[in-house]
Amino acid sequence: MGPITLNAIEECAPKVAAVTMAAIVQQESGGNPLALHDNTTGQSYRPASLAEAARLARTLIQAGHSVDLGLAQINSRNLPALGLDADQVFAPCSNLRAAQVILLGAWSQSGGSLRGALSAYNTGNATGITGARYSARVYAQAGVVVPAIPGGILARWIGSDLAQPRPDLPPVQPRIAWMPEASPLAPNGSGLGPKW
Protein backbone atom coordinates (compact mmCIF):
# COMPACT_ATOMS: atom_id res chain seq x y z
CA MET A 1 0.00 0.00 0.00
CA GLY A 2 1.31 3.41 -0.91
CA PRO A 3 1.23 6.54 1.21
CA ILE A 4 -2.11 8.14 2.04
CA THR A 5 -2.35 11.48 0.24
CA LEU A 6 -4.26 14.57 1.26
CA ASN A 7 -6.40 14.09 -1.85
CA ALA A 8 -7.31 10.57 -0.68
CA ILE A 9 -8.32 11.90 2.73
CA GLU A 10 -10.47 14.61 1.11
CA GLU A 11 -12.04 12.07 -1.24
CA CYS A 12 -12.73 9.38 1.36
CA ALA A 13 -13.77 11.64 4.26
CA PRO A 14 -15.00 14.87 2.64
CA LYS A 15 -17.05 16.04 5.63
CA VAL A 16 -14.00 16.24 7.91
CA ALA A 17 -11.25 18.82 7.41
CA ALA A 18 -8.30 16.97 5.89
CA VAL A 19 -5.81 18.36 8.42
CA THR A 20 -8.02 17.06 11.24
CA MET A 21 -8.34 13.60 9.73
CA ALA A 22 -4.61 13.47 8.95
CA ALA A 23 -3.83 14.39 12.57
CA ILE A 24 -6.17 11.64 13.84
CA VAL A 25 -4.51 9.10 11.54
CA GLN A 26 -1.05 10.19 12.66
CA GLN A 27 -2.05 9.88 16.32
CA GLU A 28 -3.86 6.58 15.89
CA SER A 29 -1.66 4.56 13.54
CA GLY A 30 1.20 6.75 12.39
CA GLY A 31 -0.18 6.22 8.88
CA ASN A 32 0.03 2.41 9.01
CA PRO A 33 -3.13 1.05 7.32
CA LEU A 34 -2.57 -2.40 8.86
CA ALA A 35 -2.09 -1.28 12.48
CA LEU A 36 -3.96 -3.27 15.13
CA HIS A 37 -4.24 -2.56 18.84
CA ASP A 38 -5.83 -5.07 21.22
CA ASN A 39 -7.49 -2.97 23.93
CA THR A 40 -8.18 -6.10 25.97
CA THR A 41 -4.52 -7.04 26.40
CA GLY A 42 -2.81 -3.74 25.55
CA GLN A 43 -0.83 -5.49 22.79
CA SER A 44 -0.20 -3.72 19.48
CA TYR A 45 0.54 -5.47 16.21
CA ARG A 46 2.06 -4.43 12.89
CA PRO A 47 1.10 -7.20 10.46
CA ALA A 48 3.17 -7.50 7.30
CA SER A 49 0.21 -8.11 4.98
CA LEU A 50 -3.49 -7.44 4.61
CA ALA A 51 -4.21 -11.17 4.87
CA GLU A 52 -2.26 -11.39 8.14
CA ALA A 53 -3.99 -8.28 9.54
CA ALA A 54 -7.48 -9.56 8.69
CA ARG A 55 -6.73 -13.05 10.05
CA LEU A 56 -5.39 -11.62 13.32
CA ALA A 57 -8.33 -9.22 13.65
CA ARG A 58 -10.85 -12.05 13.14
CA THR A 59 -9.07 -14.24 15.71
CA LEU A 60 -8.99 -11.50 18.34
CA ILE A 61 -12.59 -10.42 17.71
CA GLN A 62 -13.84 -14.03 17.87
CA ALA A 63 -12.03 -14.35 21.22
CA GLY A 64 -14.12 -11.41 22.48
CA HIS A 65 -11.37 -8.80 22.41
CA SER A 66 -11.93 -5.11 21.72
CA VAL A 67 -9.55 -4.29 18.85
CA ASP A 68 -8.71 -0.99 17.13
CA LEU A 69 -8.09 -1.48 13.42
CA GLY A 70 -6.41 0.31 10.52
CA LEU A 71 -5.44 3.89 9.76
CA ALA A 72 -7.90 5.60 12.11
CA GLN A 73 -8.03 2.67 14.57
CA ILE A 74 -11.72 1.85 14.13
CA ASN A 75 -12.89 -0.18 17.13
CA SER A 76 -14.09 -3.68 16.33
CA ARG A 77 -17.33 -3.10 18.24
CA ASN A 78 -18.27 -0.43 15.67
CA LEU A 79 -17.81 -2.70 12.64
CA PRO A 80 -21.39 -4.08 12.45
CA ALA A 81 -22.96 -0.59 12.62
CA LEU A 82 -20.51 0.63 9.97
CA GLY A 83 -21.24 -2.33 7.69
CA LEU A 84 -17.59 -3.43 7.71
CA ASP A 85 -15.84 -6.69 8.40
CA ALA A 86 -12.27 -7.55 9.40
CA ASP A 87 -11.14 -7.50 5.75
CA GLN A 88 -12.88 -4.29 4.65
CA VAL A 89 -11.80 -2.16 7.62
CA PHE A 90 -8.16 -2.27 6.50
CA ALA A 91 -8.92 -0.69 3.10
CA PRO A 92 -7.67 2.88 3.63
CA CYS A 93 -10.70 4.60 2.10
CA SER A 94 -13.19 2.39 3.97
CA ASN A 95 -11.32 3.08 7.21
CA LEU A 96 -11.32 6.85 6.61
CA ARG A 97 -15.05 6.78 5.75
CA ALA A 98 -15.72 4.90 8.98
CA ALA A 99 -13.65 7.43 10.93
CA GLN A 100 -15.70 10.21 9.34
CA VAL A 101 -18.97 8.57 10.45
CA ILE A 102 -17.68 8.18 14.01
CA LEU A 103 -16.26 11.71 14.13
CA LEU A 104 -19.49 13.25 12.77
CA GLY A 105 -21.42 11.48 15.54
CA ALA A 106 -18.86 12.69 18.06
CA TRP A 107 -19.16 16.24 16.66
CA SER A 108 -22.91 16.14 17.23
CA GLN A 109 -22.47 14.62 20.69
CA SER A 110 -20.02 17.38 21.66
CA GLY A 111 -22.32 20.19 20.54
CA GLY A 112 -19.92 21.29 17.82
CA SER A 113 -16.72 21.39 19.87
CA LEU A 114 -13.73 19.97 17.99
CA ARG A 115 -11.89 19.14 21.20
CA GLY A 116 -15.03 17.47 22.54
CA ALA A 117 -15.53 15.59 19.26
CA LEU A 118 -11.95 14.31 19.36
CA SER A 119 -12.46 13.24 22.95
CA ALA A 120 -15.66 11.38 22.03
CA TYR A 121 -13.94 9.81 19.01
CA ASN A 122 -11.37 8.28 21.34
CA THR A 123 -13.37 7.54 24.49
CA GLY A 124 -17.05 7.78 23.57
CA ASN A 125 -17.36 10.76 25.93
CA ALA A 126 -17.05 14.42 24.89
CA THR A 127 -15.68 15.39 28.30
CA GLY A 128 -13.16 13.89 30.68
CA ILE A 129 -9.43 14.02 31.23
CA THR A 130 -8.55 11.00 29.05
CA GLY A 131 -10.38 12.48 26.08
CA ALA A 132 -8.91 15.92 26.73
CA ARG A 133 -5.41 14.46 26.66
CA TYR A 134 -6.18 12.61 23.43
CA SER A 135 -7.56 15.80 21.88
CA ALA A 136 -4.39 17.69 22.84
CA ARG A 137 -2.25 14.98 21.22
CA VAL A 138 -4.26 15.18 17.98
CA TYR A 139 -3.89 18.97 17.94
CA ALA A 140 -0.14 18.49 18.45
CA GLN A 141 -0.02 16.06 15.50
CA ALA A 142 -1.60 18.79 13.36
CA GLY A 143 1.10 21.22 14.46
CA VAL A 144 -1.48 23.56 15.96
CA VAL A 145 -0.04 26.03 18.44
CA VAL A 146 -2.60 28.80 18.12
CA PRO A 147 -5.60 27.84 15.97
CA ALA A 148 -7.45 30.16 13.62
CA ILE A 149 -10.53 31.94 14.91
CA PRO A 150 -13.46 29.85 13.64
CA GLY A 151 -15.29 31.80 10.95
CA GLY A 152 -12.78 34.61 11.25
CA ILE A 153 -12.10 37.04 8.42
CA LEU A 154 -9.09 39.20 7.71
CA ALA A 155 -9.29 42.89 8.56
CA ARG A 156 -10.10 45.23 5.66
CA TRP A 157 -6.71 46.91 5.92
CA ILE A 158 -4.91 43.65 4.99
CA GLY A 159 -3.69 43.93 1.39
CA SER A 160 -5.19 41.53 -1.10
CA ASP A 161 -1.75 40.33 -2.20
CA LEU A 162 -1.67 37.97 0.82
CA ALA A 163 -4.56 35.99 -0.59
CA GLN A 164 -2.99 35.57 -4.02
CA PRO A 165 -1.15 32.33 -4.79
CA ARG A 166 2.56 32.71 -5.26
CA PRO A 167 3.55 31.38 -8.69
CA ASP A 168 7.18 31.01 -7.60
CA LEU A 169 6.24 28.38 -5.01
CA PRO A 170 5.23 24.85 -5.99
CA PRO A 171 1.84 23.69 -4.73
CA VAL A 172 1.91 21.82 -1.44
CA GLN A 173 0.82 18.20 -1.62
CA PRO A 174 1.39 16.66 1.83
CA ARG A 175 1.54 12.89 2.02
CA ILE A 176 1.19 10.70 5.05
CA ALA A 177 3.51 7.75 4.91
CA TRP A 178 4.19 5.31 7.71
CA MET A 179 7.90 4.85 8.13
CA PRO A 180 8.41 2.26 10.89
CA GLU A 181 12.14 2.82 11.10
CA ALA A 182 11.74 6.60 11.44
CA SER A 183 8.56 6.76 13.50
CA PRO A 184 8.86 7.81 17.15
CA LEU A 185 5.46 6.23 17.69
CA ALA A 186 4.93 2.99 19.53
CA PRO A 187 1.61 1.46 20.53
CA ASN A 188 -0.01 2.39 23.82
CA GLY A 189 -3.48 1.89 25.26
CA SER A 190 -5.06 4.84 23.46
CA GLY A 191 -3.47 4.57 20.05
CA LEU A 192 0.13 5.01 19.12
CA GLY A 193 2.21 7.23 21.35
CA PRO A 194 5.86 8.30 21.55
CA LYS A 195 8.58 5.80 22.51
CA TRP A 196 10.67 7.29 25.27
Question: Residues of each region from the PLM?
Answer:
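Solvent-exposed loop/turn segments at secondary-structure junctions
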Residues: E28-N32, S76-A81, G124-A126
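Alpha-helical segment that forms one wall of the substrate-binding/catalytic cleft
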Residues: S49-G116, Y139
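N-terminal secretory targeting signals
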Residues: M1-P14, G143-W196
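Export/targeting segments at the very N-terminus of extracytoplasmic proteins
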Residues: M1-T59
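Catalytic and substrate-binding regions of cell-wall glycan-acting enzymes that process beta-1,4-linked
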Residues: G42-Y45, A51, S94, A98, ...
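Cell-wall glycan
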Residues: T40, Y45-R46, L50-D68, A72-N75, ...
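Second-shell loop/turn segments in exported
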Residues: N7-E11, N39-R46, L60, L82-C93, ...
